[in-house]
Amino acid sequence: MKPLEYCNGVLKLLDQTLLPGEQKIVELKNYIEVADAIKNMIVRGAPAIGVTAAYGVAIASKAINTDSKEEFFAELAKVCDIIKSTRPTAVNLFWAVDRVYSRAVSNRDKTIEEIKKLIEEEAYLMEKEDIESNRSIGRFGNELIKENWTILTHCNAGALATCDYGTALGVIRAAHESGKNIQVFADETRPYLQGARLTAWELMQDNIPVTLICDNMAGHFMKEGLIDCVIVGADRIALNGDTANKIGTYSLAVLAKENNIPFYVAAPTTTIDFSIETGEQIPIEERSPAEITHIKGIRIAPEGVKVRNPAFDVTPNKYISAIITEKGIIYPPYDENIKKYR
């Protein structure tokens, strides 16, 4: 179920736009293909996007044919800018590209071939770190999950959104593996249906009981007492704990608070943007109207209707019970406690 695999200058991605009906691997051999794959959501999920971007820089560096370090770094910087322009909200994308570029710059005294190898090694290290991080998030998050709980999740923050195991689904997996009798309610997550297509599929692969619901049913099931907690992933977390995640997350958080249900965010510390104070500074990606007006190429809305399609929303920190990271669980007040995890 790994969404990505890199070997000998070729990045293989599981095309997530085709799941669950078709499991197709696409092979990317240049950075333009990598950038397009990120933009078109062949790969998605903040951690997976970050590592994919890092491998994209590695692939690009191999193709730069020059003996001039000045030309090499100028071309490498252009590549980094192009990859970073693909999706504006997920901070892991920028963090990952900047990290591999910094590794190259800090070793400027080495030969160009040695620098290329170091970029590749850094990307591989990031993949390894992500998997370890997700396992740790799962272990910490499992401490919050009680026997016989029903967990509501939104979008897909599982193995498909990371390099393996997952963040929000990592917590769910850890609880299941520890023997707890849990079940999951998965929002379908309009308009891209990551919950229906990806989360439900992932959980069924692992034999974790899952019930699929429409997004607008969540409040009903909370009021009926059928939901014990909500766990979601994150694409960017501000210093005060405000969290950007898939559109619809904010609504779930408000509903959870109204019904006295704990609302947890599970994310690695690489998703924390220490450069911004609040969620108001997080850019929100607006995607194609066709994602709303069409399903599988079939029009479901009137021709010419106006459409808004923000891909993310920001959940204010007051609705978040805790943030589960690989370094531990962060509780309010977030503006005091998050900075301790830098």
Curated annotation (Swiss-Prot):
Keywords in alphabetical order? Amino-acid biosynthesis, Isomerase, Methionine biosynthesis
Active-site residues from the entry: D235
This protein's source sits in the domain of life called Bacteria
* SUPFAM superfamilies the UniProt entry points to: NagB/RpiA/CoA transferase-like
Which HAMAP family does the annotation name?
Salvage_MtnA
| Family membership noted in the UniProt record | Belongs to the eIF-2B alpha/beta/delta subunits family. MtnA subfamily.
> Is the Amino-acid biosynthesis keyword given for this protein?
yes
The Enzyme Commission number assigned here is 5.3.1.23
Give the binding site residues for substrate: R44, G45, A46, R87, Q194, N245, K246
Catalysed reactions listed for this entry: 5-(methylsulfanyl)-alpha-D-ribose 1-phosphate = 5-(methylsulfanyl)-D-ribulose 1-phosphate
GO terms, biological process: L-methionine salvage from methylthioadenosine
Q: Where is this site: Transition state stabilizer?
A: C155
The task this protein performs is described as: Catalyzes the interconversion of methylthioribose-1-phosphate (MTR-1-P) into methylthioribulose-1-phosphate (MTRu-1-P).
Query: Know the name of this protein?
Result: Methylthioribose-1-phosphate isomerase
Q: Which InterPro entries match?
A: IF-2B-related, IF-M1Pi, IF_2B-like_C, Initiation_fac_2B_a/b/d, M1Pi_N, NagB/RpiA_transferase-like
Which pathway does it operate in?
A: Amino-acid biosynthesis; L-methionine biosynthesis via salvage pathway; L-methionine from S-methyl-5-thio-alpha-D-ribose 1-phosphate: step 1/6
Identify a single GO molecular function assigned to this protein: S-methyl-5-thioribose-1-phosphate isomerase activity
Read off the Gene3D superfamilies from this record.
translation initiation factor eif-2b, domain 1, Translation initiation factor eif-2b, domain 2
Recall the taxonomic lineage recorded for the source organism.
Answer: Bacteria, Bacillati, Bacillota, Clostridia, Eubacteriales
